[in-house]
Structures are given as structure tokens and as C-alpha cells.
């Protein structure tokens, strides 16, 4: 145990439900930060132990690492709680104003509600963000780039771009392992598909079973949905539903 503590940082990512490690000793991989544990990484640790004269079985090493020995890590709380105290500036309004829209008041109120819901959903296992913003403009305005920039670099891995299929197990898992799902090139939904989309937006957890686990486990939903489209018609198709906020963009300021 002392050898591992001296040479490696080992943690369990609570959002991605995976083990991650970082070597402390000088090597080609040192300084790259934490990364997922792969089979070769277990093997490397085992070889390091043997070369250091520490005798143990390889399955015991795996058991130690994949246990409560690994400290818990939440990327959302780790980042947010390290930020400086709020200075009173309305940064949400400033961020919202980087988009010029046809109805500024509606956009300001809607975006504040959505971004506050995003943070609450990320931090809490109980809160859900059931509002979906749909950004419309002509092609080439940079909607997807603007959406990506909503997240800090530390959360890059927790962004998903694309339409999800709730019947697909891997897609359903994204509800728990991503903070933003951007339904890029959203073309609206057929009348029969709207109910299914609303169920996804309101879903509060994902229940699955890994191949090597004994029982199924439940992961809380942490994602918020946003969509971008070049099709004005889809705004009319989805309009009138309280879960969706269609916004027409006339300009984007990246500065």
C-alpha cells in the first residue's frame, strides 16, 4: 500500500464510474495528469512492485486498486468549489449577451434558468434540468462552437455532441456521464417521437449492469440538453411545449 501511495495517485471518477491514475515517479507519462486505468497500467504497476521487491499477487493488486482504497473524485465539485467567491458581477447575463437574439428579455431569462439548472443538475443527484434550449440561425453562425465554449477545459470530456437514442444502452448512459448533450443539427421530432424525447429529458437516472458486476446499479442523471438547428420549421413543430425554449440568433460575439 505504501509503495502505491508513494508512486501513484489513484482515484475513482464518480461521474464516469471509472478508475484513474497518475504516476508520481519521473517517466515519459509523468506530468500528464490523471488518465483512465487500462490493462497495461495494472501490469506496469505489478512489474514496478516486483522490481521494488514488493511481493504480491496480481489479482490482489487489482483488488486493492478497485476498492475504497481509491479516493473518490467528482470533476464538477472539484472545479466549482475551487473557484473564487462570487464578486457580485452578473456573469450569466454577460455570457447571455454574447448572443444577439430576436427577443433579448426572453433569452436572458431563459438562459439564466437553464444555466442555473445545469449547475444544480451537475452537483445534485436530486435536481434535474428539464428545460431544453433550441438555438436557431442560418448555417455557419457558429452555434455549436458557442455551446462548446460554455464548459471550462477541465470539463471537455463531459460534453457530447449528437442525437441520442434512448434504446441504446451506451447512449442512455450519457445522461449520467455528461454535463451537456448538444443535439446538433436538430431537425425537430415527429409527433410520435415527441413523447419519447420528453421522457428522456425528464429521466432522473439510468439503471444498468456492467458485464463483470453482480447486480445492476443506478447512476443519477447529471446532463442538461441544448440543441442547435438551421431549420426554422422545427421551432414551429416544437413550439408551445414548456420544456423547450426556441431562440432565434442574429449574431454571436466570441470576444
What annotation goes with each model-predicted range?
Residues 179-202, 235-241:
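Conserved AAA+/SF3 P-loop NTPase catalytic/coupling segment centered on the Walker-B
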Residues 67-176:
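P-loop NTPase catalytic core of nucleic-acid-dependent motor ATPases
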Residues 170-176, 210-228:
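AAA+/SF3 P-loop NTPase mechanochemical coupling elements
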Residues 177-179, 204, 221-224, 239-245:
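Short glycine-/polar-rich loops that comprise or flank the Walker A/P-loop
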Residues 1-91, 102-105, 109:
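N-terminal nucleic-acid engagement/recognition segments and initiation subdomains in replication
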Residues 235-254:
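A short helix-turn-beta junction within AAA+ P-loop NTPase domains corresponding to the substrate/partner-engaging
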Residues 194-217:
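Conserved catalytic/switch belt of AAA+ P-loop NTPases
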Residues 230-233:
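Short, polar loop motifs at secondary-structure junctions
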Amino acid at each position: 500500500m505504501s509503495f502505491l501511495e508513494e508512486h501513484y495517485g489513484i482515484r475513482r471518477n464518480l461521474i464516469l464510474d471509472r478508475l484513474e491514475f497518475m504516476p508520481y515517479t519521473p517517466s515519459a507519462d509523468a506530468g500528464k495528469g490523471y488518465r483512465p486505468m487500462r490493462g497495461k497500467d495494472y501490469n506496469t504497476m505489478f512489474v514496478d512492485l516486483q522490481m521494488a521487491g514488493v511481493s504480491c499477487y496480481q489479482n490482489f493488486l487489482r483488488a486493492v486498486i478497485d476498492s475504497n482504497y481509491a479516493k473518490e473524485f467528482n470533476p464538477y465539485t472539484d472545479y466549482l468549489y475551487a473557484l473564487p467567491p462570487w464578486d457580485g458581477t452578473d456573469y450569466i447575463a454577460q455570457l447571455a449577451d454574447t448572443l444577439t437574439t430576436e427577443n433579448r428579455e426572453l433569452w436572458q431569462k431563459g438562459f439564466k434558468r437553464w444555466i442555473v439548472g445545469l449547475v444544480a443538475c451537475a452537483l445534485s443527484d436530486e435536481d434535474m434540468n428539464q428545460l431544453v434550449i433550441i438555438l436557431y440561425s442560418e448555417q455557419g453562425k457558429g452555434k455549436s462552437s458557442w455551446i462548446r465554449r460554455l464548459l471550462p477545459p477541465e470539463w471537455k470530456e463531459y460534453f457530447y455532441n449528437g442525437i441520442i437514442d434512448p434504446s441504446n444502452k451506451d447512449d442512455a448512459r450519457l445522461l449520467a456521464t455528461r454535463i451537456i448533450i448538444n443535439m446538433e443539427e436538430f431537425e425537430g421530432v415527429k409527433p410520435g417521437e415527441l413523447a419519447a424525447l420528453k421522457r428522456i429529458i425528464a429521466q432522473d437516472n439510468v439503471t444498468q449492469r456492467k458485464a463483470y458486476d453482480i447486480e445492476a446499479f443506478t447512476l443519477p442523471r447529471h446532463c442538461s440538453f441544448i440543441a442547435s438547428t438551421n431549420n426554422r420549421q422545427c421551432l414551429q413543430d416544437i413550439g408551445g411545449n414548456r420544456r423547450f425554449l426556441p431562440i432565434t440568433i442574429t449574431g454571436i460575439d466570441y470576444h
